[in-house]
């Protein structure tokens, strides 16, 4: 009997790149492979795959249980191809793995790889220069916090780099994680330093990078009146907080498929795309009340101001920005932009800024003690970026069943009588996405949370009655299980959004968050 394929890949049909980049967690059966063995990723149609295989979890006998596979392959025939892991048929020649090219000084950290170089200041908040194919870009963070955090001293408290190597024996790292931990120290000794973490995840030779950021308020809460509510004295009140990148000789462009403006012209005046609400039917939902029990949104319409033309439109923005220097370009695409309002994209000649938070006047964002907020965007740079497309991976449910990594998981579950009821979570009138709209489960704190509408059974009246699940792990596990069984990316999206909300908002112990992706989720998440 032939062993089933481990996973398959799919790319968007509208993209024109010839190569596919992928990152996927893959399970392995107990006793099959050990860390000492060199594993390669193979396509069943024989086409070339360049991939790094990194151990992530082990069975009790120390055999590999989960590995992270990150790599690149041609898009030719990809839709029909299957992927497996195996030992190479021929023992590859000895090759010394090269450490990333790093230079450190008391005030700088420089990381060079392929045609890019990050030169990072240690005494400023994620600030420095990015050099791509010889072209220089400057980047940094803009912030406007209210007292006692209005005057902060930033310092790079810790950083580390994790390289991954492919099976080609070139010796070069093909994938790098660079993580930077900052402390933002207030002049008020009664408050603990805020924490800001940046992780750059990039394919070194392919011009693609993900920028992940997390802002944490680690201070203990007062719990006035024995409650955990808004308005705590140690809350961080944010008026503006964002990351910018610029080039003195560059030109900037903004684009958005949902907004009406002329995007072909380069930016030559102050321009802005500002998402102030979800612009949904229930944008004024009680979930958006502030500590004074007042609505934190005064005007729901999105602001579109480009090259002097300004309008307010009821749209859900999904912007992208381009910064061009000659033939070298940099493209910035935020993830889940409108869902995490209030947020904005601004630009001027030669500069683009993504405002993680941009609050309305007199409605600052309140990051409570114990809360954090994470954001992510994609960066595409260098002449290679347009040649590659990010692929979506699907694990083969037969292989997951064979590996026995998830208790009671079986492809036979799709024929269970309960499956038709479970499917209503996607297709029913009260599916999970419809519930989001009903309560307007959007905004930076709410997005990903689940509306517990079953608790409204005895509610009288027409007004919305917000309530949320407190056993978040059950639906998180369920969403992932349904994704594995069906391959439906909607289940995976629900799991990703919920897990991010749990990590950022719901879990806090001893002043620090516990990353509770659950071992299963850690392995799924690329």
Language model region names:
Residues 5-15, 217:
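Asparagine-centered strand-capping/turn motif at beta-strand->loop junctions
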Residues 65-88:
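Intrinsically disordered, low-complexity Pro/Gly/Ser/Thr-rich segments with frequent PxxP/GP/PP motifs
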Residues 36, 41-67, 347-356:
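Solvent-exposed beta-strand/loop surfaces of large extracellular or lumenal domains
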Residues 466-484, 526:
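Well-ordered alpha-helical segments within folded domains of soluble proteins
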Residues 387-463, 508-525:
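Low-complexity, Ser/Thr/Pro/Gly-enriched N-terminal "stalk/linker" regions
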Residues 11-37, 226-248:
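Surface-exposed beta-strand/loop patches in extracellular or lumenal glycoproteins
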Residues 108-402, 437, 442, 446-454, ...:
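Beta-strand/loop-rich accessory regions of lumenal/periplasmic or secreted enzymes
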């Amino acid at each position: 009997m032939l062993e089933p394929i481990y996973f398959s890949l799919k790319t968007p049909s509208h993209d024109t790149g010839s190569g596919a980049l992928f990152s996927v967690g893959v399970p392995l059966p107990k006793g099959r492979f050990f860390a000492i063995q060199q594993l390669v990723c193979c396509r069943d149609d024989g086409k070339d795959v360049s991939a790094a295989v990194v151990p992530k979890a082990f069975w009790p006998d120390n055999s590999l249980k989960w590995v992270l596979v990150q790599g690149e392959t041609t898009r030719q025939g990809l839709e029909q191809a299957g992927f497996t892991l195996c030992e190479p048929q021929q023992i590859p020649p000895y090759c010394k793995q090269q450490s990333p090219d790093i230079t450190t000084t008391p005030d700088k950290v420089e990381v060079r790889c392929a045609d890019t170089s990050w030169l990072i200041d240690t005494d400023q908040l994620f600030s420095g220069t990015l050099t791509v194919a010889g072209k220089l870009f400057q980047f940094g963070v803009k912030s406007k916090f209210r007292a006692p955090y209005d005057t902060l001293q930033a310092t790079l408290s810790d950083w580390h780099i994790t390289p991954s190597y492919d099976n080609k024996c070139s010796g070069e790292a093909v994938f790098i994680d660079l993580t930077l931990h900052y402390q933002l120290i207030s002049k008020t000794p009664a408050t603990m330093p805020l924490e800001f973490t940046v992780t750059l995840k990039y394919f070194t030779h392919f011009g693609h990078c993900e920028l992940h950021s997390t802002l944490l308020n680690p201070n203990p809460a007062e719990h006035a009146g024995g409650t955990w509510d808004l308005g705590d004295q140690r809350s961080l009140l944010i008026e503006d907080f964002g990351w910018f990148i610029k080039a003195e000789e560059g030109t900037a462009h903004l684009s958005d498929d949902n907004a009406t403006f002329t995007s072909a012209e380069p930016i030559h005046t102050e321009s802005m795309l500002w998402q102030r609400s979800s612009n949904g039917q229930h944008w004024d939902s009680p979930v958006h009340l502030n500590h004074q029990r007042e609505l934190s949104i005064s005007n729901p319409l999105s602001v579109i101001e480009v090259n002097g033309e300004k309008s307010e439109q009821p749209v859900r923005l999904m912007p992208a920005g381009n910064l061009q220097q000659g033939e070298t370009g940099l493209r910035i695409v935020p993830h889940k932009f409108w869902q995490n309002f209030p947020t904005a994209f601004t630009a001027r000649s030669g500069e683009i800024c993504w405002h993680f938070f941009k609050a309305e006047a007199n409605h600052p964002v309140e990051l409570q003690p114990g809360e954090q907020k994470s954001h992510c965007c994609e960066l595409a740079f260098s002449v290679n970026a347009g040649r590659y497309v990010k692929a979506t991976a699907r694990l083969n449910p037969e292989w997951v069943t064979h590996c026995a990594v998830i208790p009671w998981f079986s492809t036979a579950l799709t024929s269970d009588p309960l499956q038709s009821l479970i499917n209503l979570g996607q297709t029913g009138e009260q599916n999970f996405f419809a519930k989001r709209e009903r309560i307007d489960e959007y905004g930076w704190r709410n997005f990903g949370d689940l509306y517990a509408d079953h608790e409204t059974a005895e509610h009288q009246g027409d007004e919305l009655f917000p309530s949320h699940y407190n056993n978040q792990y059950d639906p998180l596990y369920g969403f992932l299980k349904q994704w594995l069984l069906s391959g439906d990316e909607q289940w995976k999206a629900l799991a990703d959004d919920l897990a991010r909300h749990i990590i950022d908002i719901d879990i806090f112990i001893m002043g620090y968050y516990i990353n509770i992706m659950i071992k299963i989720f850690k392995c799924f998440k690329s």
